[in-house]
Regions:
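Hydrophobic, well-ordered beta-alpha structural blocks that scaffold small-molecule cofactor pockets
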Residues: 2-60
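Catalytic, metal-anchored helix/loop core of enzyme active sites in primary metabolism
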Residues: 5, 78, 99, 105-106, ...
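Adenosine-phosphate binding glycine-rich loop
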Residues: 13, 115-141
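Residue-level detector of alpha-helix initiation sites
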Residues: 25-27, 82, 128
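Conserved SAM/SAH-binding loop
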Residues: 61-65
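Alpha-helix C-terminal capping/helix-to-coil transition sites in glycosyltransferase folds
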Residues: 69-71
């Protein structure tokens, strides 16, 4: 449960779908890598990107509402709560699924820790409370 909400576990086909990540730091990098692993068409928006940031379409600028047009889902992973809240509001107006890296309680979705074994995918979620614990559980063989 996130903030008292039980979240519905679901597997989404994002192959070829536009997914936008706002942010250019470590958290955004992890989210981008996860989306790429599942075949998403990723656009990242940030005035600055950390060294080694994945090679995706980059909008090197401050966020604006037009950046999420036609997105299937959006992840707000900036280090600025106000910007993340603006992204949330813009996504909600457009009926776009949105995840706030700093506010799982108000997010439409969270990305669980997942491991693929051929045709089997195992996902573990602590509902945003302890991503490190979910990662440890996922790594149990």
């Amino acid at each position: 449960m996130v903030g008292g909400k039980l979240m519905f576990p679901i597997m989404l086909n994002i192959r070829g779908r536009k997914c936008t990540v706002a942010g250019g730091g470590n958290v955004a990098e992890r989210k981008v890598k996860t989306l790429l692993k599942y075949g998403a068409d990723v656009t990242a928006v940030s005035p600055v990107f950390k060294d080694g940031f994945p090679n995706v379409k980059r909008l090197e600028k401050e966020y604006s509402s037009s950046d999420i047009e036609n997105s299937f889902l959006v992840i707000a992973a900036t280090d600025n709560k106000e910007v993340n809240q603006t992204i949330y509001n813009d996504a909600k107006k457009r009926n776009i699924l949105v995840s706030l890296s700093d506010d799982t309680e108000h997010s439409d979705f969270i990305l669980p820790s997942s491991k693929n074994y051929d045709d089997i995918t195992i996902s573990v979620s602590t509902n945003g409370k302890s991503p490190a614990l979910a990662k440890k559980i996922r790594q149990i063989k």
